[in-house]
């Protein structure tokens, strides 16, 4: 069973209904992956992976998407790894459309302030045991709130694995779609009441569109200007909170804005014993030198 979007009350800071992926409840209404998306080029996006995990407390097998930001590290959403054991997670990467390889997980690094019920700090890192072979390049991270000043939006790409609107996608092929991404309380949450705590780390959001992430896409990358800007976290419908079906024209998707977590990402990796030199220009995180200890 895949992780699916559910409707719930975010009691700490949202009074309207939103939908996030939750391992405990299956929403059988959501049958699509990236709604109205298309297969992505594996050679162009070699850093894309998906992983399956067994949640024994709920007796469910869940699936999420992730991005290789370094040879040993997969960036994803915390609700994808919450209550999962590292021994029960398997990470897969397609070499081509007919062949994929797998890696086991050595450690899970979930954000220490992650709130599963409120959806705050929904970010996690997986350290795999060994690097995948023949990865041409990894995804670098970037993004800054100033890029969205004066109501500006960016054309971005969302990628994910899972079911499609035409099949159950048993092979878990990856799909992508183009989105117009906004930032700011007025742009993203004009119909939703938020507290100050949430507004300090405002997510990115898409304009209402039939193109949106669905089950299996959670944790997947939002790529803007060729860089990783966000992580797929939730969907919501400000016009009709009861209509959370993928492909609904008023549906919007929300993404954790990596800008607010750049220090957490770099510090978490540094504390694992890996040496990483970061170049921070306009808060853009790019890897210049990586030296790994494979012990």
Predicted region positions:
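Protease-domain processing segments flanking chymotrypsin-fold serine proteases, especially trypsin-like
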Residues: 2-75, 84, 90-92, 189, ...
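Acidic glycine-/aspartate-rich tracts in secreted/extracellular proteins
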Residues: 79-82, 94-96, 129-134, 162-165, ...
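Disulfide-rich extracellular modules and peptides
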Residues: 82, 158-160, 190, 207, ...
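Active-site region of chymotrypsin-like
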Residues: 44-62, 133-138, 183-218, 229-231, ...
């Amino acid at each position: 069973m895949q992780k699916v979007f559910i409707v719930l009350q975010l009691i700490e800071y949202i009074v309207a209904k939103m939908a996030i992926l939750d391992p405990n409840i299956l929403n059988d209404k959501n049958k699509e992956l990236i709604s109205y998306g298309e297969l992505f080029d594996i050679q162009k996006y070699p850093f894309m992976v998906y992983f399956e995990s067994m949640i024994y407390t709920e007796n469910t097998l869940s699936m999420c998407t992730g991005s290789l930001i370094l040879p040993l590290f997969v960036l994803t959403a915390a609700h994808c790894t919450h209550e999962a054991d590292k021994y029960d997670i398997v990470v897969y990467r397609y070499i081509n459309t007919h062949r994929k390889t797998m890696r086991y997980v050595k450690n899970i690094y979930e954000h220490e302030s992650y709130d599963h019920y409120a959806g705050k700090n929904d970010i996690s890192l997986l350290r795999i045991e060994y690097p995948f072979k023949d990865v041409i390049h990894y995804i670098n991270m970037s993004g800054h709130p100033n890029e969205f000043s004066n109501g500006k939006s960016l054309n971005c790409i969302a990628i994910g694995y899972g079911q499609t609107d035409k099949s159950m996608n048993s092979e878990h092929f990856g799909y992508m779609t183009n989105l117009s991404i906004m930032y700011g309380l007025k742009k993203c949450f004009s119909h939703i009441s938020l507290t100050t705590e949430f507004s300090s780390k405002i997510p990115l959001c898409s304009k209402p569109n039939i193109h949106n992430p669905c089950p299996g896409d959670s944790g997947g990358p939002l790529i803007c200007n060729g860089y990783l800007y966000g992580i797929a976290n939730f969907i919501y419908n400000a016009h009709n909170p009861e209509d959370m079906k993928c492909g609904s024209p008023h549906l919007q998707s929300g993404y954790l804005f990596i800008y607010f977590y750049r220090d957490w990402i770099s510090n978490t990796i540094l504390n694992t014993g890996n040496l990483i030199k970061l170049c921070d220009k306009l808060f853009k995180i790019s890897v210049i030198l990586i030296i790994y200890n494979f012990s």
